[in-house]
Amino acid sequence: MSPAKKGEKAAKISETCFICDKIEYGLSRMIETVYRTYETQKDFREMFNSQPQFCLPHFERLMASYDKKKMRSYGGEFTENLCRITSDYLKRIYGDISEYCKLYDYRAAGEKNGDENVMNSVENTVAFLTGRKPEE
């Protein structure tokens, strides 16, 4: 068997995993529930639209799975608010991480910034990019 064929066979084997398939199925159903609930329940829309942030992996998943046919009434509002929330949070963590970097610049020697968001900006950025919060 050629190396290319062996690689293809290994890729097919590693494509499926019972646990990964179950997790993926559950997550895709949850995403569908978000769309359906946003479309049908005003309280959920208000709660969703007032969130301070969504992690990048879930933003990506919600945008990639979005289908206008499933969200006829509120689809535009949904994507607009999802983008607004994520963009606002991205701007905030960009500002925080910039301030954090300035703290370690030699020109800022002796200056202190007691802002908790600035001091936690690295952890907050990792959580945003990966969807995982660093261990306490």
Q: What annotation goes with each model-predicted range?
A:
Residues 1-136:
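Intrinsically disordered, low-complexity regulatory regions of eukaryotic proteins
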